[in-house]
Amino acid sequence: MRVLTGGVSPSSSSFEFVPLSVVSFGSTVIAEGCDAATSISWIHAWTVANGIITQVREYSNTSLTVTRIGNVVAGRRSAEIAPPSHCSSVWESQFSGRAGKPVPGLVLAI
């Protein structure tokens, strides 16, 4: 929990979250940023239901692509899965390569 809150113990150095972008796709909210020295990039993906965060995912020094799978009609997901050729990328991280080193890439399907 220390990483998510930015809280620190007396024996560790502090970490300052610097958010650079926040976007939402339906019930998923993505926040991306880095530390104050821009040496560590981070991405938080929150799932929100009825105004309450119900799930949190945290990625550090990782490139993330958010892809929509399935059809959304009138704000509701249909049970039908879209063919792979119709899976569209709706967001890609921008700041994961700032540290000048290669990072792993992940796909978050929503």
Curated annotation (Swiss-Prot):
GO biological process: leaf senescence; response to fungus; response to molecule of fungal origin; response to nematode; response to ozone
Induction: Accumulates in leaves during senescence. Induced reversibly 4 days after exposure to ozone O(3). Triggered transiently by Nep1, a fungal protein that causes necrosis. Expressed in nematode-induced giant cells (e.g. M.javanica) at early stages, 3 days after infection.
Classification via InterPro entries: NTF2-like_dom_sf, Wound-induced_1/12_sub, Wun1-like
One Pfam family of this chain: WI12
Protein name listed in UniProt: Senescence associated gene 20
Organism: Arabidopsis thaliana (Mouse-ear cress)
Biological classification of the source: Eukaryota, Viridiplantae, Streptophyta, Embryophyta, Tracheophyta
